[in-house]
Design a protein with these regions (language model features):
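Hydrophobic, lipid-facing positions within transmembrane beta-strands of outer-membrane proteins
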Residues: 11-15, 31, 51-55, 89-93, ...
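C-terminal structural cap/anchor segments
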Residues: 67-116
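Repeated loop/turn-to-beta-strand initiation elements of outer-membrane beta-barrel proteins
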Residues: 23-29, 63-69, 101-107, 135-147
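Acidic, glycine-rich loop-and-beta core segments that form the ion-binding/anion-interacting portion
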Residues: 1-54, 58
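Residue-level signature of outer-membrane beta-barrel architecture
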Residues: 15-19, 23, 59, 97, ...
Length: 174
């Protein structure tokens, strides 16, 4: 058929550093290079080479507040017969606040930029954020509520969207 053979080999080399600064700031950061080569065929999928990195930070400025920051650049698989994969860059930030042992608030934001490898269209940026509240009734039961926003900007109006979601629930922990 016309579907390409997706067999490939991938090599990724990274070096990194892990740290703990005064038991308040923890982190792991790596940087490297990756390459993926597809077998010679018709249609040919484009080989991919790119800078890669992964950053994870956790900061506890107080015993009630935690800030998490993550960044990643990599290549993910795709099922498209025209595209070798999506090169993506992702960043997230989340803040947890625990004013009492029974109450948790989380605010988070994220953004991801996708760049399909092998075509000039299809770039997309997805972004979003959420607010979460959880009240723990006891060791097994809690009540949660979340408001989330997500959106996508692309050069194709069919694939762009914006949405707001609201959810509430009761959680049983086994």
């Amino acid at each position: 058929g016309l579907a390409p053979d997706r067999n490939s080999y991938r090599v990724k080399g990274e070096v990194g550093l892990g740290f703990d600064i005064s038991q308040r700031l923890y982190g792991v950061a790596t940087i490297g290079y990756l390459t993926r080569k597809y077998r010679d065929q018709v249609p040919q999928l484009r080989d991919v080479s790119s800078l890669s990195y992964n950053i994870n930070l956790l900061w506890n400025p107080t015993e009630y507040l935690t800030v998490r920051v993550n960044g990643l650049r990599d290549i993910q698989e795709t099922a498209s017969p025209l595209v070798a994969g999506d090169q993506f860059t992702r960043g997230t930030v989340a803040v947890d606040y625990v004013p009492t042992p029974a109450l948790l608030f989380t605010a988070s934001a994220n953004a991801v930029h996708y760049n399909p490898v092998g075509v000039t269209t299809g770039n997309a940026t997805e972004y979003g954020g959420s607010l979460l509240g959880r009240y723990r009734l006891n060791r097994r039961w809690s009540v949660t509520s979340r408001v989330s926003y997500n959106g996508r900007d692309t050069n194709s109006p069919i694939d762009s969207f914006d949405g707001i979601w609201v959810s509430m629930g009761i959680v049983l922990t086994l």
